[in-house]
Amino acid sequence: MSSDSFQRQLVQRTNTLNSSIDNATLTILSRFQDILDIAINEGKDKYTVAPEVYQIECHTVSMVRAVEQLLDVSRQIKSYWLTNSLSTSFPTVDYSEPDLEKVKRTLTKLQNHLLEVSLIEPEASETTEAPTVSDT
């Protein structure tokens, strides 16, 4: 899979998840506002309050569904992350065995050189004497 198609797929998934989050958030906020508008109880009789209680229950159920939708989005993101669903589409680079062996040899040489340098430096610091202060 090419890098461009992977990027398009990633953007599409991101946009889908963002729109799900936006829709759920909008539903929660609008239903909460509806509940607040209905909840104003200024001298209402019980025949008016009863249908309003039912409306509040319906809005509450809608809010719960929206929260469940947000939890589902969270689960999807975790699933993509845990199963590497996003990274399985990364373009792969094919290495041949000679290339890997060359890299291994180069890293081994570098490691050996660094070990030699670290062994030489302490010996050099041991042979140098600290400057002395003369009494004059």
From Swiss-Prot:
Subcellular location(s) per record: Nucleus
InterPro entries xrefs: Med22
Keywords assigned: Activator, Nucleus, Transcription, Transcription regulation
GO CC annotations on file: mediator complex; nucleus
Major localization listed first in the record, in broad terms: nucleus
Keyword Nucleus attached: yes
One BP term from GO: transcription initiation at RNA polymerase II promoter
Domain of life: Eukaryota
Short name of any one Pfam family annotated for the protein: Med22
GO MF annotation terms: transcription coactivator activity
Subunit structure, as described in the record: Component of the Mediator complex.
UniProt similarity note: Belongs to the Mediator complex subunit 22 family.
Job description of the protein: Component of the Mediator complex, a coactivator involved in the regulated transcription of nearly all RNA polymerase II-dependent genes. Mediator functions as a bridge to convey information from gene-specific regulatory proteins to the basal RNA polymerase II transcription machinery. Mediator is recruited to promoters by direct interactions with regulatory proteins and serves as a scaffold for the assembly of a functional preinitiation complex with RNA polymerase II and the general transcription factors.
Annotated protein name in UniProt: Mediator of RNA polymerase II transcription subunit 22
Organism: Schizosaccharomyces pombe (strain 972 / ATCC 24843)
